[in-house]
Curated annotation (Swiss-Prot):
Catalytic activity: (2S,6S)-2,6-diaminopimelate = meso-2,6-diaminopimelate
Organism: Chromohalobacter salexigens (strain ATCC BAA-138 / DSM 3043 / CIP 106854 / NCIMB 13768 / 1H11)
Family: Belongs to the diaminopimelate epimerase family.
Protein name: Diaminopimelate epimerase
Subunit composition and interactions: Homodimer.
Compartmental location: Cytoplasm
Chief place of localization: cytoplasm
Keyword flag Cytoplasm: yes
Binding site residues for substrate: N13, Q46, N66, G76, N77, N159, N192, E210, R211, G220, T221
Amino acid sequence: MLLHFTKMHGLGNDFVVIDLITQRARLDTERIRQLADRHVGIGFDQLLLVEPPRDPEMDFRYRIFNADGNEVENCGNGARCFARFVRDNRLTHKREIRVETQAGPLTLRVEDDERIRVDMGVPRFAPEVVPFDAPADAPAHCLEVDGETWDIGAVSMGNPHAVLRVDDVAQAPVARLGPLIERHPRFPRGVNVGFLQVVSRHEARLRVFERGSGETLACGTGACAAVAHGIRRGWLESPVDVHLPGGTLTLAWPAPDASLMMTGPATSVFEGRIALP
C-alpha cells in the first residue's frame, strides 16, 4: 500500500505527519524506526499521527512517536504542526482545535498572523509527576553526573524535563551531558534535557537534547519547561522570547496556577507517498 504523508517543521524540529482518519496503516516500533532513518527512510525527529478522537468533546487524537519508535506524551512544536496540518488538509475549519494526547487535552489556536498558539497546560514540579527520584518538590535539585554535581530543575509539561542553567549555551556540553542525563537512573522514564542561558528577564537562549531523538533544532515543551523553571527561580519574567537554534518561540506564564501559552510558527515542507508492505 502507498501511505500519504506530509513533512513539516516547527523551527527546524522536523516531523512526518500522517492522517489516519482518511487512510489506514499499522505502524509498529520497527516500522517507525525505518521511516525515521534519514538515509533509507523519510527522516524525522518525531512522527505525528492524526486519529479520530476517543473523547467526543475533542476534535482529534494527537499521537507522537520519537525516532526510536517509542510513543511519548507531548510535543509542543509538533502540536503547532498538527494544527496547521488539520487546517491545511481541511479536516477542520476551526481556528480553535481541541486534541487529546497521552498527557491530557490540548487547545491549539491558529492566530490571525497564522502563527499557532498552544495552551500547554500548567507546569508541574512534583517529583512523582515528572517522574524524578527526589524526596520532595524543590526549586532546584542536585544531580550527580559523570563525577560532577549539577543544579537542575525537574519539570513536567506532560513529558519529563531536566533544566540546567549555563553561562553560554553555545559552549554548553550538550553532546556529553545530554545522553547521560537522558538515561540517568533518577529519571525512571528518561528525560529531555534543556541547557538554558538567561539573556535578560524577558529573553533566553536554549538548546535541548530530546529523549529518544538527541539534540534537535527546537523543542516546544523544552522551551516551556525552561521558562517555567526560570520564572520559578526568579531569573525570568513572563512573557519570554526563547531563542533556539531553529528560531524563536514566545512563552507566557502569568501565574503559577495558570496555563503556559506557547506561540510560534509551523511550516509544511513537502508531501509524499511511501510504500508499506
